[in-house]
């Protein structure tokens, strides 16, 4: 804007003067008069203020002091002390001369965009056309990098032309706007992400089964995490993602029904691995389904053995009971004596009958020989007793006593046969152990009636049987 205004003011100058005096800044400058005082060291060298071409670049080597430039600017504005100070007014027409002091002599004050308008940041544009940047971040256009008030010439101040200042201001404005835009964009992005995350966080989890969409805010953590309600987590078939699926407890996700075995709630793959970890591997490497059944427990075998022993004990107890009941057979003899009637007083006066019965031997003979042993001996004794009674010629009382004794012996023989049958199991197991005891089995039986008859007839009816 400023350059266009300066160009508009310079159009009123004649073409020859403009062609001779126009420099790179776009406005006409007075003739270069020699003057002293630009060097801060007071060297007094004569320098041309404005030169055409590359001579003007000597102004930016750091030898120009801003205080001297300001004094020169005021002198040029007032037209005092400098020859040719009113050169523009003399060369320009009256209209242009009237407009020139307002546009060139009055320094224009402006602030850089994007910076606070303070006294330190206000820079005069106009007569001298020099700008000094003391504070704030400044980009070094010549060097292409960033810098402050120190330029390429280290230790000296750097001054820029108005065009350079405008370029720097544009870069500053662009960078600041870009930074602000980036910061705003990042801020909005972060804010947007925060809002989105907050919205996502506050959105309640819902069941992923189609048609359910149950709110799982008050459900268990497991159901909230896997987004499935309690009902669909245990359902046999669930419509999810357009397919009939089932929720796997091992995988914690939905699988198609083909991956499950029947009504299992864990997929086949994970269930196989789970069972393999829990069960011990077999010796043959067979699976649990093909493995043979486990052997019967020792407890059952012991129980069966104990039961067999118990049964044998029962048989032994029964045998002993039968043997003990043999004692009651003597009572039967007493009953027969009562029937006879002749020996009631004798039986009352006689001492009670006694019977000593030792342990019976096991059955070692064959089945055909069941009538041998004690039965044969008893029969032989009864036969000899009958012959003896007949030879002596005793009365009917002796015959009745002999018959009762014969009945007693037969009952004892019958009980012996029953004992053999009942003690069969014990004889098979303990046959070898009882061989050495066979010689000690003695059956002795005595009767009070026999003792009475022996006292009368001087005969002993006491017999002993050894089983060999």
Swiss-Prot record:
<feature type="region of interest" description="Disordered">
    <location>
        <begin position="270"/>
        <end position="305"/>
    </location>
</feature>
<feature type="short sequence motif" description="Bipartite nuclear localization signal">
    <location>
        <begin position="264"/>
        <end position="280"/>
    </location>
</feature>
<dbReference type="GO" id="GO:0008270">
    <property type="term" value="F:zinc ion binding"/>
</dbReference>
<feature type="binding site">
    <location>
        <position position="248"/>
    </location>
    <ligand>
        <name>Zn(2+) 2</name>
    </ligand>
</feature>
<comment type="function">
    <text>Trans-acting factor that binds specifically to the consensus nucleotide sequence 5'-TNCGTACAA-3'.</text>
</comment>
<keyword id="KW-0539">Nucleus</keyword>
<dbReference type="GO" id="GO:0005634">
    <property type="term" value="C:nucleus"/>
</dbReference>
<feature type="binding site">
    <location>
        <position position="267"/>
    </location>
    <ligand>
        <name>Zn(2+) 2</name>
    </ligand>
</feature>
<keyword id="KW-0862">Zinc</keyword>
<feature type="region of interest" description="Disordered">
    <location>
        <begin position="405"/>
        <end position="458"/>
    </location>
</feature>
<keyword id="KW-0804">Transcription</keyword>
<feature type="binding site">
    <location>
        <position position="207"/>
    </location>
    <ligand>
        <name>Zn(2+) 1</name>
    </ligand>
</feature>
<keyword id="KW-0863">Zinc-finger</keyword>
<protein>
    <recommendedName>
        <fullName>Squamosa promoter-binding-like protein 5</fullName>
    </recommendedName>
</protein>
<feature type="binding site">
    <location>
        <position position="251"/>
    </location>
    <ligand>
        <name>Zn(2+) 2</name>
    </ligand>
</feature>
<feature type="binding site">
    <location>
        <position position="212"/>
    </location>
    <ligand>
        <name>Zn(2+) 1</name>
    </ligand>
</feature>
<keyword id="KW-0238">DNA-binding</keyword>
<feature type="binding site">
    <location>
        <position position="255"/>
    </location>
    <ligand>
        <name>Zn(2+) 2</name>
    </ligand>
</feature>
<dbReference type="InterPro" id="IPR004333">
    <property type="entry name" value="SBP_dom"/>
</dbReference>
<feature type="binding site">
    <location>
        <position position="229"/>
    </location>
    <ligand>
        <name>Zn(2+) 1</name>
    </ligand>
</feature>
<dbReference type="Pfam" id="PF03110">
    <property type="entry name" value="SBP"/>
</dbReference>
<dbReference type="InterPro" id="IPR044817">
    <property type="entry name" value="SBP-like"/>
</dbReference>
<feature type="zinc finger region" description="SBP-type">
    <location>
        <begin position="204"/>
        <end position="281"/>
    </location>
</feature>
<dbReference type="InterPro" id="IPR036893">
    <property type="entry name" value="SBP_sf"/>
</dbReference>
<feature type="compositionally biased region" description="Low complexity">
    <location>
        <begin position="438"/>
        <end position="458"/>
    </location>
</feature>
<feature type="compositionally biased region" description="Acidic residues">
    <location>
        <begin position="363"/>
        <end position="372"/>
    </location>
</feature>
<feature type="binding site">
    <location>
        <position position="232"/>
    </location>
    <ligand>
        <name>Zn(2+) 1</name>
    </ligand>
</feature>
<keyword id="KW-0479">Metal-binding</keyword>
<feature type="region of interest" description="Disordered">
    <location>
        <begin position="354"/>
        <end position="374"/>
    </location>
</feature>
<keyword id="KW-0805">Transcription regulation</keyword>
<dbReference type="GO" id="GO:0003677">
    <property type="term" value="F:DNA binding"/>
</dbReference>
